[in-house]
A protein has these predicted regions:
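Acidic, Ser/Thr/Pro-rich low-complexity intrinsically disordered segments
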Residues: 20-31, 60-174, 180-185, 194-197, ...
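Periplasmic peptidoglycan-binding/anchoring modules of Gram-negative envelope and division proteins
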Residues: 302-336, 364, 404-409
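Short, acidic Ser/Thr/Gly-rich low-complexity loop/linker segments typical of extracellular
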Residues: 224-242
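Structural motif
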Residues: 204-216, 221-223
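A short, solvent-exposed loop/turn motif at the edges and junctions
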Residues: 245-272
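A short, Gly/Thr-enriched small/hydrophobic beta-strand-prone motif that recurs across taxa
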Residues: 91-93, 195-208, 294-299
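Periplasmic OmpA-like peptidoglycan-binding domain that tethers envelope proteins to the cell wall
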Residues: 337-409
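Extracellular beta-sheet/turn segments enriched in Thr/Pro/Gly and aliphatic residues
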Residues: 267-294, 298
Length: 409
């Protein structure tokens, strides 16, 4: 009954939102040290385990193995067993993150293809599909798991890679995951799953005014973290590009273009679908660096009622800095904008000026001469989305922005 109630709790949390964390209490964790008592989890949310497992339970399912085995622990020490059904057809990854970074967590991942998995395990009839028994790495916060960039399915003990290779899974496949805190301890850990799809994006890069082809460096970047996912170049004659990349399901990405004598561009790739591999075809027109040309920085946004920029703005800021560093004669006007004027025009004017000045100060701090920079606020007079009553959160964020105008080049 306790296991059924715990599973229902997880289902309720799932329907409240995929981003919600699920907390697993110490009692539940300590009752799951055997395969037969594995906790059934939803491998979508972030799972927070308040305590580490204590002991190996009533049965020592994994034992008498060689310390050099790439498949198994030598024996269980302090284990917790989890089981789950895969929600997608995808490449599955996960991170096991200890609260105390001195802890050494190992894991084995089994695919359950028979009805009596735990019994077969006791008779050594089951081999894991992934394992990582490496020594913890304090420099990497002792994290382990499956990673999209890892190369090996099985990692033995000793000083070895922290991640094992991502696993291709199909929806509704059933898996058992056993996690072992080798040397013990009370502090807990978190478990975060992510799922990747193979994606393709192709298109053409052109001059905004002449439609002529542009040779450009092309980058796929996570909209959440700014992490670079893939990189390629467009054809110097046709401007065409074709790029494969692996995208996390339910995350957005930016396609970035960087071309000589042109502004960079940032194109949002819509929320990643859960369907099979798909291809996106884009036509991107980029403005040339010339007097009176304007660039809208859709990713350089601010917190509401604040001139503090969002963390997601940092990659755009760095691109703007590189643009100024690589074009020493470029002089720009930084325009600040607000989402409406709820505090009045005077307050909105001050806020928009502060936003523009924040970007100017960032560039000066990083070596751009102040003589090349002018900042100005435009209050709420140039909102991209002026309908305040119906604006979505995304549209409101787009209004809280800066734009760049070329004064001289």
């Amino acid at each position: 009954m306790k296991k059924i109630w715990f599973f229902l709790t997880i289902l309720l949390a799932y329907f409240h939102g995929l981003s919600q964390n699920i907390i697993i209490d110490c009692i539940t964790s300590k009752q799951a040290s055997d395969c037969y008592s594995a906790i059934e989890i939803n491998p979508v949310n972030k799972l927070l385990f308040n305590c580490s497992p204590q002991g190996f339970g009533s049965q020592l399912e994994i034992k008498n193995n060689s310390p050099k085995s790439i498949f198994f622990f030598e024996k269980e020490h302090n284990t917790i067993w989890l089981k789950f059904n895969c929600p997608y057809d995808a490449l599955m990854c996960f991170d096991i993150i200890p609260i105390d970074t001195t802890y050494d967590f190992d894991f084995l991942l089994f695919k359950n293809e028979e009805n009596d998995f735990c019994k077969n395990l006791n008779y050594n009839h089951e081999k894991p599909v992934r394992s990582n028994i490496s020594r913890n790495n304090l420099k990497n916060k002792s994290i382990t798991g499956l990673n999209i960039n890892a190369k090996k399915k099985y990692i033995p003990s000793g000083i070895q890679p922290m991640y094992s290779k991502a696993l291709k899974v199909n929806k509704s496949e059933n898996y058992f995951l056993v996690i072992d805190n080798v040397y013990g301890g009370e502090s807990g850990f978190s478990l975060q799953f992510s799922y990747y799809k193979e994606k393709n994006i192709k298109g053409k890069i052109m001059d905004k005014n002449t439609n002529s082809a542009i040779y450009s460096n092309i980058i796929i970047e996570s909209a959440n973290s700014g992490e670079q996912i893939a990189e390629s170049q467009s054809d110097s004659v046709t401007g065409e590009f074709n790029l494969d990349y692996k995208a996390i399901i339910n995350e957005d990405y930016y396609l970035i273009t960087e071309s000589k004598n042109y502004f960079f561009s940032e194109t949002l790739i819509n929320t990643i679908s859960k369907t099979d591999t798909f291809s996106t075809n884009l036509e991107i027109k980029v403005p040339k660096l010339k007097k009176n040309e304007n660039l809208k920085l859709h990713n350089l946004n601010f917190y509401g009622d604040s001139y503090e920029y969002l963390p997601t703005a940092i990659p755009s800021l760095n691109r703007l800095l590189s643009l100024m560093q690589n074009n020493s004669t470029l002089k720009i006007l930084i325009e600040g904008h607000t989402n409406g004027c709820p505090g009045g025009i005077e307050y909105s004017q001050m806020l928009s000026e502060q936003r523009a000045k924040t970007i100017k100060d960032f560039l000066i701090k990083n070596g751009v001469k102040k003589q090349r920079l002018v900042s100005k606020g435009f209050n709420c007079s140039k909102m991209l989305y002026p309908n305040m009553e119906t604006n979505s959160d995304w549209e409101k964020m787009m209004n809280r922005r800066v734009e760049i105008l070329v004064l001289d080049f």
